[in-house]
Amino acid sequence: MRNVWLIVPFALLAAFSGETWAQADRDLYIDSTESSGNYPVDDDDYSSGSGSGIPAHDDDEDNVVLTTVQTLISSPSSEMPYVDTTTLKTQTKMAPETKEPGEVESTNTVLVHENKNIIQTATHTENLFHRTEVLAAVIAGGGIGFLFAVFLILLLVYRMRKKDEGSYDLGERKPSSAVYQKAPTKEFYA
């Protein structure tokens, strides 16, 4: 009966505190749901925006731009005719490639200098261990783990040596002094 009287107040406390939390949750948002940004679903703009819907043009075709620049020298002679420069720029769009599990970031950068017609390509492939902060954390963790292992081995060796010396308490009881009593030296002749 005593257990029932202990359980009843706790059950009532739980019921009233649950109701209080529900009331506090309702009082948290004073405004209506529309002013808080909770609108009904609007599917009118389903295909608009970046990366949604079917694209208007095909991304698999190559875009080729042909540029012809004629540079005329001020006075053409038989030694120096005019120069006809043709520049062919090709932009190829490729399908996105999936990353390997260990690879974090892969970026391709193409730098084009228009006046010198020099194209430089830089490729950055970076996996998890090429990042300096991850590498520093792995090295620090390995060092701390190594020190912990050395400390543990030294502690075990210390305890083994102490046990061999006999000063280590193994929990064994010493025999009482009554066991080591000297035998009587009196001799009885019968």
Curated annotation (Swiss-Prot):
PROSITE patterns: SYNDECAN. Residues 23-136 are extracellular. Residues 1-22 form the signal peptide. Keywords: Glycoprotein, Heparan sulfate, Membrane, Proteoglycan, Signal, Transmembrane, Transmembrane helix. It is a single-pass type I membrane protein. It is found in: Membrane. Cell surface proteoglycan. This is Syndecan-2-B. It comes from Xenopus laevis. The gene is sdc2-b.
